[in-house]
């Protein structure tokens, strides 16, 4: 069925919902055509392609939510979902503590086309495999006998989402995302080191064609090799400078999740009750911006049909706002800001980040480190996790560089940092004019995965706990 046909069916379902006197109804069609493959040590470890399409319908009836979905494009199946959702809502209403309220937002009627040069759905799997093999072979050649493991992956997805609700919104959004990545583990005796590089954008297969091996697998291989001869990082408290990749990891894990308003209303965030107060150093601002062209985490409309926006979380140290759905905005008495996203048709929209970052400052990296007698520069952000309600976080860096007498010195390995979120951000003393937004990821929350990105400038912390070798 054509996109126009899907829109007409959604409008028809919306009209049926209105006949049944529900307070609110939202019908959302979603389809994805995707492919992916992964090589491991020269072998095809995973290859696949597929297409899924279906519809999910949410209703508010008697003050309660109901939801049902079907992997189908048949109107009869959609109508059955509507009836099931209404029945669920009315049963739930009998056990309701407080009725569902949704914030008002102007109705949107729009169609968004995907922007790309080479449609990945038209590129053969053989061509995709050849590109991935080229990346892996370049890394193997660079690493030689010190290779312990090579992994190279490619994924693409073409999405269509159509949102239609009883408030007059009818929004169709298309997007194409492509990702390629390489991870290499090197070994020298008992020492093993890992490095990885990722390129991911809202783009087609042209992303792969514009990414030479030396910028992806070659870069990862060079780092993994150099780390074999590096000494372990020292453990203790030090002044630390974060590379933009570590900055992105920190703001995503430590602030971004805490700023999701569903965590606020559930009492699971350290930012609860702190709106309008100082939560970071004066030099720190934090934004989540869904409007950046081509970025992995961007979108024109969220899964409730609300325009994506640039959302200010922290401005010059003051907590200004949170990421909201229609429901959380109503609960907190603020305007919605387009932060509700759903992973496919079978999931309900929940509050999610997009591109989360600290905006750049005015200092150079050289100026940032000039007064540090002994400290560390952390680069190559790899992973992190956060306990939202406790305000604790851990971030692991793929590489560290010692700072001695105001200058970059020797490379170190096996370094991580941990601390209390607000304490760390209060100890930021300077940020750089250099800026990167290159931490694309598929973030998991409540069983849903969503495209997000993160980044920022170099950030100087007065003192932080570094995990290494004592």
Go through each PLM region and give its residues:
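N-terminal small-residue-enriched
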Residues: 1-470
């Amino acid at each position: 069925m054509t996109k126009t046909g899907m829109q007409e069916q959604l409008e028809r379902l919306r009209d049926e919902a209105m006949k049944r006197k529900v307070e609110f109804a939202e019908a959302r069609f979603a389809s994805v055509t995707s492919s992916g493959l992964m090589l491991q040590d020269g072998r095809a470890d995973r290859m696949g392609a597929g297409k899924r399409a279906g519809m999910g319908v949410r209703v508010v009836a008697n003050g309660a939510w109901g939801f049902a979905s079907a992997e189908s494009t048949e109107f009869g199946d959609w109508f059955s979902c509507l009836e099931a959702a209404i029945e669920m809502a009315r049963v739930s209403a009998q056990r309701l503590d407080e009725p569902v309220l949704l914030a008002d937002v102007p109705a949107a009627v729009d169609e968004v086309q995907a922007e790309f040069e080479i449609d990945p759905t038209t590129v053969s799997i053989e061509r995709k495999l050849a590109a991935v093999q080229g990346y892996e072979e370049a890394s193997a050649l660079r690493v030689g006998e010190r290779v312990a493991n090579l992994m190279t992956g490619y994924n693409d997805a073409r999405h269509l989402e159509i949102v239609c609700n009883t408030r007059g919104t009818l929004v169709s959004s298309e997007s194409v995302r492509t990702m390629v990545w390489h991870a290499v583990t090197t070994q020298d005796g008992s020492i093993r080191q890992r490095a990885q590089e990722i390129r991911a954008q809202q783009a087609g297969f042209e992303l792969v064609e514009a990414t030479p091996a030396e910028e992806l697998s070659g870069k990862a291989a060079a780092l993994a090799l150099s780390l074999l001869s590096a000494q372990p990082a020292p453990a203790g408290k030090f002044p630390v400078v974060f590379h933009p990749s570590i900055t992105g990891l920190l703001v995503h894990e430590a602030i971004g999740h805490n700023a999701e308003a569903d965590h606020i209303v559930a009492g699971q965030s350290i930012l609860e009750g702190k709106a309008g107060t100082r939560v970071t150093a004066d030099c720190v601002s934090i934004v989540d911006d869904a409007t950046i062209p081509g970025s992995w985490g961007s979108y024109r409309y969220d899964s409730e049909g609300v325009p994506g926006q640039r959302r200010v979380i922290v401005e010059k140290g003051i907590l200004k706002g949170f990421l909201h759905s229609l429901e959380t905005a109503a609960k907190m008495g603020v305007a919605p800001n387009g932060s509700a996203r759903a992973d496919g048709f079978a999931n309900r929209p929940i509050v999610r980040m997009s591109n989360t970052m600290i905006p750049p400052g005015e200092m150079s990296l050289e100026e940032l480190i000039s007064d540090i007698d002994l400290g560390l520069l952390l680069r190559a952000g790899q992973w992190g996790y956060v306990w939202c309600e406790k305000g604790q976080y851990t971030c692991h860096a793929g590489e560290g560089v010692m700072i001695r007498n105001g200058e970059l010195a020797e490379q170190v390995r096996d370094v991580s940092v941990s601390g209390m979120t607000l304490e760390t951000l209060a100890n930021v003393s300077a940020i750089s004019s250099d800026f990167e937004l290159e931490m694309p990821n598929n973030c998991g929350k409540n069983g849903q995965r969503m495209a997000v990105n993160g980044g920022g400038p170099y950030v100087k912390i007065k003192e932080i706990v570094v995990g290494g070798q004592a």
